[in-house]
Design a protein with these regions (language model features):
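Low-complexity, acidic/Ser/Thr- and charged residue-rich accessory regions of DNA metabolism proteins
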Residues: 39-40, 77-128
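Phosphate-backbone recognition surface of nucleic-acid-processing proteins
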Residues: 2-3, 7-88, 92
Length: 128
């Protein structure tokens, strides 16, 4: 886990340089793509523009969190499990990317407010 954290910091740099978590999403390449032509407007999958290494690390973090959820509870794995149970049509990769987005928002909020992660606070505060 420490090696993963070091690799992630090496790829993302200081998260304080971003104004919003959406900017981090775009930097990593998990922001939603859009197609517009005339009056047609459709949403695509993720853009994949950005740091592909950071995107892979974050994806692997979600899978690692899933394996240790029994001993180390996290609101992100709770979210992943809830989405997995409620959606028969959505694939696990889409759910994992949604969880990556939630992880980015959580990391950004914790760094912005200079706080440590607390599972009890995270489950009370649904925005994290």
């Amino acid at each position: 886990a420490r090696i993963t954290a070091v690799r992630l910091v090496a790829e993302l740099g200081d998260l304080r340089r971003f104004s919003t978590s959406a900017q981090i999403d775009a930097f990593v390449g998990i922001d939603p793509g859009r197609y517009q032509s005339g009056e047609k407007d459709s949403s695509l999958g993720i853009t994949k523009h950005g740091n592909h290494i950071a995107r892979k690390i974050l994806y692997r973090v979600i899978t690692q969190m899933e394996t240790v959820k029994a001993t180390q509870p996290c609101h992100i794995t709770d979210y992943y499990d809830k989405k997995k149970r409620s959606s028969n049509r959505q694939g696990y990769k889409k759910i994992a990317i949604a969880s990556v987005h939630k992880l980015i928002r959580t990391m950004f909020a914790l760094i912005k407010h200079d706080q440590l992660y607390d599972y009890n606070v995270a489950t009370e505060n649904k925005r994290l």
